[in-house]
């Protein structure tokens, strides 16, 4: 039987998936050892061109999206590797306030979201993959650690509005074994046919839309599609989606400029470059 989510009354937490800018400093040592190449080779990271030395690059075959690009998002029943972030209080779930996705990693325990989503949460959040209509078909996973870039910690840099989250194991199995995972795309072209998934605040189901991304600025992506209000922050920009699994390569998350956009019809993301790669390596090393 799939667990049903019972919300706690008056749970504290972020008032919005795209809150007003607030500086946040993750209280951990900024320095971290880099993970070895042999360990990182176990994780699939998609690059625009093969890396010379360092981390091994692996490529996936592009899979067609099927339907044509759209201008408006539509609700759907969800997909296993994308879910909602919930506040927690005294062991009970509160409301969902942002979106996250499972990303491939050697330990199978990392999520990807926007850094502004975890401002002030102090780790009191949980992830519900595939959440829809009050159900948790792939269990509830507590977030145990948060990893953000020092540039974000220091000044809330819009180009570093990215966070990796470590989740605790449930019954010994890592989350990736349960849900599958998206691949992490680094340095990919800004113009891609892209599927974006997000959980609007208070909505029983996620929304999905696909359209062409474009470069808004040298370090920011733009995605034009309606239906992405507060709560969709952290939602993945997915390309090369496999219709059989619903999984693909994530090249961005709703965030960055205007913390993802002041209008529900236009969403933004920081482009994933060397900064995101370094943050991922650090998260893998410490998770």
Label each residue range with its predicted role.
Residues 75-132, 212-217, 225, 269:
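Catalytic histidine site
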Residues 227-253:
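Catalytic nucleophile loop of clan PA
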């Amino acid at each position: 039987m799939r667990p049903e989510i019972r919300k706690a009354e008056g749970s504290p937490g972020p008032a919005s998936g795209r809150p007003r800018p607030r500086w946040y400093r993750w209280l951990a040592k900024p320095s971290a050892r880099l993970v070895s190449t042999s360990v990182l080779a176990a994780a699939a990271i998609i690059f625009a061109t093969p890396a010379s030395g360092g981390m091994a690059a692996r490529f996936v075959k592009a899979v067609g999206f099927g339907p044509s690009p759209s201008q408006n998002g539509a609700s759907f029943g969800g997909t296993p590797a994308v879910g909602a972030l919930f506040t927690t209080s005294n062991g009970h779930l509160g409301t969902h306030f942002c979106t996250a996705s499972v990303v491939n990693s050697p330990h199978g325990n990392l999520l990807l979201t926007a850094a502004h989503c975890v401002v002030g949460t102090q780790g009191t959040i949980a992830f519900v993959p595939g959440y829809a209509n009050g159900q948790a078909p792939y269990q509830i996973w507590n977030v145990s650690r948060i990893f953000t870039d020092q540039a974000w910690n220091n000044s809330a840099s819009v180009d570093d509005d990215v966070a990796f989250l470590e989740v605790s194991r449930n019954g010994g199995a890592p989350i990736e074994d349960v849900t599958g995972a998206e691949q992490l795309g680094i340095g990919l072209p800004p113009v891609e046919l892209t599927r974006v998934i997000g959980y609007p605040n208070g909505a029983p189901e996620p929304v999905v839309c696909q359209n062409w991304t474009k470069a808004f600025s040298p370090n920011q992506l733009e995605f034009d599609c309606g239906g992405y209000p507060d709560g969709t922050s952290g939602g993945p920009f997915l390309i090369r989606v496999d219709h059989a699994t619903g999984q693909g390569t994530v090249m961005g998350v709703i965030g960055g400029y205007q913390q993802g956009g002041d209008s529900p019809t236009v969403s933004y993301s920081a482009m994933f470059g060397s900064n995101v790669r370094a943050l991922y390596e650090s998260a893998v090393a410490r998770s």
